[in-house]
A protein has these predicted regions:
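ATP-binding glycine-rich phosphate-binding loop
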Residues: 2-31
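ATP-binding glycine-rich loop module of kinase domains
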Residues: 25-73
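Short beta-strand micro-motifs within the conserved protein kinase catalytic domain, predominantly
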Residues: 91-102
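Activation segment signature within eukaryotic-like protein kinase domains
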Residues: 130-131
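Catalytic-loop of the protein kinase fold
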Residues: 142-159
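Conserved catalytic-loop aspartate of Hanks-type protein kinases
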Residues: 217
Length: 249
């Protein structure tokens, strides 16, 4: 897909760009006079009758696709009541398959180019607004029984307003219902912000699935707060590599 192509009624405005660990691509698209952010998932891909592979292989891939669809639609439905444009949660507005690929559409956000070091330089009152707005967004999720699952500074967009700044919480691809995380081998994200219980679950060292609740996000939020206020993550034993690992030591 390239600029000018149309996907499910969305006109692609720029060529897609690969992001993160190469698991997806994104660009901007227009529909009915409004611009959107659109993400193309590189995996899974849906095999049609002409796809290579045995019938058994294609059936296995289709089962995986069905599970992928169920997961995304479940989170989308859980957040349906807060899915309007303009809020501080940038949730899925549209999710669909086009050919073999899956796509997700969200509101387009004009974010300020501010990282944790830039936030540290802001007046404390501005910092406080940022801390409060991201916490409020997280509470909306948590009140609906949803764990974000990949909370980190790059998923907290900072937007300039007439009065200063606010935050927009994005990227719910790794979200799950509290106590119902995906299998350990399917969890992806940034380990720097993993909670101790999430580390234990992934390493299969005694943490059960039901123990992964909203608390995992609160651990990550604390790390983000530290970066926003000091410019650097909290100090811990370097041998542990990650804060969540250090907290389990």
């Amino acid at each position: 897909m390239k600029a000018g192509d149309v996907i499910n009624g969305y006109t692609i405005l720029e060529d897609f760009r690969v992001v993160g660990a190469g698991l997806s691509k994104w660009t901007f698209a227009a529909k009915d006079g409004r611009e959107y952010f659109i993400k193309e998932f590189l995996s899974p891909t849906y095999p049609d009758e002409h796809a290579p592979g045995s019938a058994q292989t294609k059936m296995r891939k289709r089962r995986r696709c069905a599970a992928f669809e169920r997961h995304h639609r479940r989170i989308q439905e859980a957040l349906a009541s807060v899915s309007g444009v303009g809020g501080n949660l940038i949730v899925t507005l549209d999710f669909f398959r086009w050919g073999a690929k899956y796509y997700k559409v969200t509101e387009k956000v004009e974010a300020a180019d501010l990282g944790p070091a830039d936030v540290t330089a802001l007046a404390f009152q501005d910092q406080l607004v940022l801390l409060k707005t991201v916490a409020h967004s997280l509470r909306i999720l948590h009140d609906r029984g949803i764990v974000h699952g990949d909370l980190k500074p790059s998923n907290v967009l900072i937007k300039r307003t007439e009065l200063g700044y606010t935050t927009k919480l994005i990227d719910f691809d790794n979200a799950y219902l509290a106590g119902e995380p995906p299998p350990p081998e399917e969890i992806v994200g940034t380990m720097n912000y993993y909670s101790p219980e999430l580390v234990g679950y992934i390493q299969e060292t005694g943490t059960a699935a039901h123990e992964l609740t909203q608390k995992a996000d609160i651990f990550a939020l604390g790390l983000i707060y530290a970066e926003f206020l000091t410019g650097t993550p909290p100090a811990f034993d370097a041998a542990s590599q990650y804060a969540g690992v250090a907290a389990r030591a």
